[in-house]
């Protein structure tokens, strides 16, 4: 199914007859988006817009995911759902545009802004890369001047489905609601794993191989309701699930 193709989307809905659709697809490579602008736009803007229009025609609720990258980072307290967007990079602009387009196309859409994923089932997220490096005795570089809100993926899934079932609409911020720098997050996770926190190299974001500009503060908080557990509980569950996986 190509969600950027109207015929493909309409055919899939007719075939599977879902009661709702959750769109977890999209272009996620923030740095590469600076040069893959057309692909980023197609996957992050055109696709969700076409899908939203198809869901509106079929009367289906829709969940789409957005990002903390829609903000400019000029605040020093967490962004809520009503703060003005001001993306700094191509990826962030694609997410801000997608929000506007899907909300214009469909009145029964839930837009979930989230941030800084980690989960037990992949080895590419921040925490997994940290643990791998430290476990091999290698230093791990993490920004000490960029503040985010880490999000445990299983909690995000549970909260998204709860809101969908409850018929919630509009923009929601879903994270584990703790604002901290990448380097502090790395030290906390390393300590939980009983690895050497001294191998965490706190550095400035300018010293990292990032090509796309990023907000230095993009922590999120919901002014609608708190529906996700805190970060301590998220890390507890992460390490339990990781041991099982």
Model regions and ranges:
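Conserved catalytic-core motifs of eukaryotic protein kinase domains, centered on the activation segment
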Residues: 31-38, 73-77, 123
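C-terminal amphipathic/interface module of NAD(P)-dependent oxidoreductases
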Residues: 198, 213-245
């Amino acid at each position: 199914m190509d969600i950027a193709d109207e015929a493909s989307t309409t055919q899939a809905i007719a075939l599977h007859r879902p009661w709702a659709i959750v769109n977890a697809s999209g272009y996620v490579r923030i740095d590469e988006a600076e040069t893959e602008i057309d692909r980023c736009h197609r996957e992050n803007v055109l696709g969700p817009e076409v899908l939203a229009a198809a869901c509106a025609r079929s009367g289906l609720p829709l969940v789409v995911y957005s990002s903390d990258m829609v903000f400019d980072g000029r605040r020093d307290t967490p962004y809520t759902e009503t703060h003005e967007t001001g993306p700094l990079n191509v990826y962030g602009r694609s997410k801000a545009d997608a929000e506007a387009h899907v909300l214009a196309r469909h009145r029964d859409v839930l837009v979930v802004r989230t941030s800084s994923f980690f989960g037990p089932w992949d080895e590419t997220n921040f925490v997994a890369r940290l643990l791998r490096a430290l476990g091999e005795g290698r230093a791990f570089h993490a920004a000490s001047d960029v503040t985010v809100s880490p999000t445990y993926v299983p909690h995000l899934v549970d909260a998204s489905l709860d809101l969908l079932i409850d018929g919630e609409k509009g923009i929601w911020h879903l994270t584990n609601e703790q604002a901290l720098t990448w380097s502090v997050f790395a030290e906390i996770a390393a300590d939980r794993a009983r690895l050497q926190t001294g191998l965490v190299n706190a550095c400035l974001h300018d010293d990292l191989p990032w090509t796309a500009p990023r907000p230095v503060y993009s922590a999120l908080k919901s002014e609608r309701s708190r529906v996700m557990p805190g970060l301590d509980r998220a890390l507890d569950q992460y390490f339990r699930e990781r041991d099982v996986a």
